[in-house]
Swiss-Prot record:
GO cellular component: cytoplasm; excinuclease repair complex
Name of the protein in its database record: UvrABC system protein B
Organism this protein belongs to: Streptococcus mutans serotype c (strain ATCC 700610 / UA159)
UniProt-listed GO biological process terms: nucleotide-excision repair; SOS response
NCBIfam families from the UniProt entry: PRK05298.1, uvrb
Subcellular location, record wording: Cytoplasm
Helicase ATP-binding domain span: 31-188
UVR domain location: 627-662
Primary gene name: uvrB
Binding site for ATP: 44-51
Keywords for this protein: ATP-binding, Cytoplasm, DNA damage, DNA excision, DNA repair, Excision nuclease, Helicase, Hydrolase, Nucleotide-binding, SOS response
Summary of the function given for this chain in its UniProt record: The UvrABC repair system catalyzes the recognition and processing of DNA lesions. A damage recognition complex composed of 2 UvrA and 2 UvrB subunits scans DNA for abnormalities. Upon binding of the UvrA(2)B(2) complex to a putative damaged site, the DNA wraps around one UvrB monomer. DNA wrap is dependent on ATP binding by UvrB and probably causes local melting of the DNA helix, facilitating insertion of UvrB beta-hairpin between the DNA strands. Then UvrB probes one DNA strand for the presence of a lesion.
Amino acid sequence: MIDRKDNNQFHLVSKYEPSGDQPEAIEALVDNIEGGEKAQILKGATGTGKTYTMSQVIQKVNKPTLVIAHNKTLAGQLYGEFKEFFPDNAVEYFVSYYDYYQPEAYVPSSDTYIEKDSSVNDEIDKLRHSATSALLERNDVIVVASVSCIYGLGSPKEYADSVVSLRPSQEISRDQLLNDLVDIQFERNDIDFQRGRFRVRGDVVEIFPASRDEHAFRVEFFGDEIDRIREIESLTGRVLGEVDHLAIFPATHFMTNDEHMEVAIAKIQKEMKEQVRLFEAEGKLIEAQRIRQRTEYDVEMLREMGYTSGVENYSRHMDGRSEGEPPYTLLDFFPEDFLIMIDESHMTMGQIKGMYNGDRSRKEMLVNYGFRLPSALDNRPLRREEFESHVHQIVYVSATPGDYEMEQTDTVIEQIIRPTGLLDPEVEVRPTMGQMDDLLGEINTRADKGERTFITTLTKKMAEDLTDYLKEMGVKVKYMHSDIKTLERTEIIRDLRLGVFDVLIGINLLREGIDVPEVSLVAILDADKEGFLRNERGLIQTIGRAARNSQGHVIMYADTVTQSMRRAIDETHRRRQIQMAYNEEHGIIPQTIKKDIRDLIAITKANDSEVAEEAVDYNAMTKSERQEAIKKLQKQMQEAAELLDFELAAQIRDMVLELKAMD
């Protein structure tokens, strides 16, 4: 039994008060939610404090909230911000727990079967368990998730029904508790005490929940009765206090009881026989033999252990679902009246739409060649329309909402004023004739003032040629393209901010982490070439790169003004006029954002000081030196994760993978 708390209130902690047009945006969003409006858009310009507005709305409507971002890095940033805003509430993080993931696949042309291979991040697995258990225990929960939240997770009812509930004076034998823990996939290990494990010492059972990383619980028996339950430090065993009730959630999200397991196994065997008959009728004897062997092995594991590698492929049978019925996901763990907020919705909704098709084509190949039963096709992400069926109320958040969001609602709430008083940059169009000389002059003007320049081109070749030309002209310039790995990419951004060079050229500079306050000029070459990077949304996003500096300016080099250019320029000008009027009325002088330059590359010294060693050239290292560097980076990654700085942890993880690839 779970003691659910339904009356908790969200409490926002911040030294700031809503300013600019935040109060109006907050009031409008809250009124619409309380008035039963299903969908609305928060159209907020870059740097206007959209996350703070979202937090204010969550506090006022007091509903469990799911915030979806389009990648792990952005989800990590949002998680950190919400954690600061709501220290007294449950702020959870739910993303894919794979550091490395090679999905199961089959390539018929070379007769190559690729077995599923993955590396699970233990810290993220803990946070996923923390998210699901929090949703079942309390109402004041914010879960920040990636699109991983639309993938199959197991039945929330089975998960909740499997909870082992313990109280002092409860009549239960020690051995019964041990059996119950094994049933919910806990592992006994009296030596290595980790998450999802328990250990036994006489009449004392110590349990380490899957959702914790430092605190465990000590259950002390007197005969066949629980004498007391104490919370302890998992490492030292130091007692932290006594508890009146302990709910132990399963160590896996894919739970089923013995009765359901037998029914599921019968269905799996029936489906296997049908598939074998089908293959044999088509003369596919190898496929028939393959599916029989693989399924019989999995069934044996399920009978003996209650689990098998790839158990999720049998989730349709385990959950008792019909063919084609959507899987259970994180969304099913929320109560019916929860709130969804989609961050950067123009990107995220596209991802939600695309996940199903990519997964389906890979699995069909496995089914057709006898590696998986057809029911594996129902272990899948949700289709977009299935996602929509879970939506009670939703807020799309973006500076440039997509067509899909605009079709869902006419309710658009704008947030244009920045708390810093910064204006959207001035945008001008200049002809392509003589553009190189013109651009060179603009770059030198900025460099003399200690400011930086972004240049965006359409092709790799043009970016390379422009880099060579500017170098010949004495400009300190670098070029960033998609082939550059994380190690170099973070180094390049850091060097740009430090002034090691003045100009950064790229094809798509809209990726996360490219917010550089020192950039006062953004030059867009071939601005009149319509396409993905030169459509209205792409141009507005690119213009936004100059919105962090009080001297922000954008030059579009073009011979004609396209419809996309006109709309982007008009929208930027409209915002700028509103911002200028507000600043004048309130006596605000725009200030460039001050942002610390964090060293992501240098390996820190192994002492308590925060002084970093000089950046290291990893290519010049010997193999043993690289191994030592990997150990240091892994330690930093763990420390960053413990401090909940998942953005930094993810970047260090990528560096480690690249260093390993050098050997």
